Amino acid sequence: MKKTVLSTILLCTAVVAMAQPAGWFGGFQIPEIKLETSQEWKDVNYAGDDQAYHTCDIYLPKQTKESYPVAIHIYGSAWFSNNSKGMADLGTIVKSLLEAGYAVVCPNHRSSMDAKWPAQIHDIRAVIRFVRGEAAKYRFDTHFIAVSGFSSGGHLASTAATTNGIKQALVGTIEIDLEGQIGNHLKESSMVNAACDWSGPVDLTAMDCGEHITMGDNSPEDVLLASKLDKEPDKYLSLSATNYVDSNDPPIIIFHGEKDNVVPGCQGKKFFELLKAAGVKTEATFPAEGSHGGPAMYTEENLNKMVHFLEEVRINSTNAKTKQ
């Protein structure tokens, strides 16, 4: 298998990422742009602790309504950045969601330098509970909450979906707390109705399933877990969204490029097959020229597929509740 060693890049990334926006290592990112919104809030603390890594930006669609369905979109950074919400695919994924009528929440989360796994999923679940707890203030319609993410953000979105409703799990010999105790809305649910996985590493036990760039002696997942796969495989299973797939998972749509050399496309393909086998509603697109982010991934066709999938799930969910 062809591999390129980038240990120097990893070292530099690890040093600067805690205070820097997501850059190349998190995939292709479009610089911060001005979105068309009716209202927005920046640097809202969702945990009540005054930490920058526990803040989020909230955007409401240009068309004003009493309330909006919600999409939480998480940036990619190989878990190295704790402050990249301002570059969370604003000109592509977030823009499309806003135009489709979704309130969009872009959160920061703790990096692998701030805390080890499962702190990151604790943060994302805190965001979901915050959305429910502060629904009246921000005009959120909590009957539908989707979670989306790119790269490591796709991993967190996928894991939030496949662990839906699971607060603790026994993975081999490891008992993992998936819920956490972050924020002021601990009585709220952290469940989601749908998820979008853009190029996410979802099986951290099999990152060598295809050609990809390696990051020297310590991969991003090694740093996140402070371990090695051959020493503590159960830790890597506990980090893998694929480990938790079952028939109770919400609908999940996957986008993964065939030419992705950061997170190989076989990750998305394995996820897709596992979801189908479990009977989960799922769709997947594997662009032939798609890399890790970039124009071949964020085409109008793919963005429309994402929106159509979420709308179909949302409408079907609404109709089902009406019939009850």
Regions found by a protein language model. Give the residues of each.
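Bacterial Sec-dependent N-terminal signal peptides
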Residues: 1-24, 324
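Alpha/beta-hydrolase superfamily serine-hydrolase fold, recognizing
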Residues: 20-324
